Amino acid sequence: KAVALAPAPNPEGSLSRYLTDIRKFPMLEAQEEFELAKDYAKSGDTKSAHKLVTSHLRLVAKIAMGYRGYGLPIGEVISEGNVGLMRAVQKFDPDRGFRLATYAMWWIRAAIGEFVLNSWSIVKTGSNAARKRLFFKLKGVKARLGMLDDRELSPLETRQIASELQVPEHEVTDLSRRMIGSD
């Protein structure tokens, strides 16, 4: 039932059109958001949930854009983020005093992160928690060092990253190759 609350980016459609379309949904004032969340929590009113979800679709798109470098279709990343947003709306307790966006960021990132991990061959071939942490740390270090292009790392770059992450160079090389899709 909740999956129908958010419009999904059309894989055949234009991402820019989707981003334009979601801007048409108004952002909510704190009081209106609180009242809608109370209505949904009390009665399960899907109209209230729909308003809460659609008013936060820009947040999902913004968070999803941070995952562009993983080589996954951004429309699918946004769709997974939308699932996280809907889950956040379902679980949100307005009486705790926080705005929905603050709470939803965690659920959106969790849904997208899970999608990214499930989409990568390193996870499909059996991964452990340390490998998953290395996956995300490598992405962050490459971004910080300005190595966002999809190319193999030079031996110097590999040594630099391995030293910073305190892992063997072969792990950095292997993971980096998987991230650029040459596995």
Give residue ranges: language-model regions.
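Short intrinsically disordered, low-complexity coil segments enriched in acidic
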Residues: 1-4, 183
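Alpha-helical promoter-recognition and RNA polymerase-docking modules of transcription initiation factors
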Residues: 3-125, 129-147, 160
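Long, charge-dense, solvent-exposed interaction surfaces that engage phosphate-rich ligands
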Residues: 142-183
